[in-house]
């Protein structure tokens, strides 16, 4: 038995994983750099999205190399992803959520919010108040041990941290 094919497969996997990590690091660097110039906060983006339904999650992200503010909203039994201009506050695009992975996430987030007693915005405000100098990058609700929580990602300079905030 020749060990070369096995070594080649291992090296190929390492190369692919390294490329993925580098891409993620590049996106994170772009996110950090771009967030500094965003005039809108995540909380303001959630408030603006309320005109289109109940905000169920939100995030600043880099997708396909482009920095954007995305908010998932629920309106009755329909879910949409809104793209908010992070400088003007205008909703620039609204897309129905139909892909199974995104749709499953939206349903899970919406279900978690049925147990919530405070809004996502209020949860973000609490997380930010408890972390001086940090800014909210994303908020995602979930159920943990039967209780509604919000996972809030915060950023200060290049330091990112995740804060779990009760929604009850």
Question: Language model features by range: what are they?
Answer:
Residues 2-13, 17-168:
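Long, terminal "pre-/pro-" and other extracytoplasmic accessory regions
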């Amino acid at each position: 038995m020749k060990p070369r094919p096995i070594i080649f497969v291992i090296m190929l996997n390492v190369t692919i994983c390294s490329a993925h990590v580098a891409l993620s690091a590049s996106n994170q660097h772009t996110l950090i750099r771009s967030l500094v110039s965003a005039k809108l906060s995540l909380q303001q983006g959630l408030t603006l999205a309320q005109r289109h339904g109940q905000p169920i999650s939100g995030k600043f992200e880099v997708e396909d190399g482009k920095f954007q503010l995305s908010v998932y909203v629920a309106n009755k039994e329909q879910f949409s992803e809104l793209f908010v201009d992070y400088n003007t506050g205008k909703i620039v695009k609204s897309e129905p959520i139909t892909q199974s992975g995104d749709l499953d996430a939206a349903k899970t987030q919406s279900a978690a919010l049925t147990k919530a007693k405070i809004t996502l915005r209020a949860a973000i405000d609490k997380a930010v108040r408890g972390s001086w100098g940090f800014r909210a990058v994303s908020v995602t609700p979930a159920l943990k041990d039967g209780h509604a929580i919000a996972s809030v990602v915060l950023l200060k300079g290049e330091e990112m941290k995740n804060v779990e905030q009760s929604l009850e």
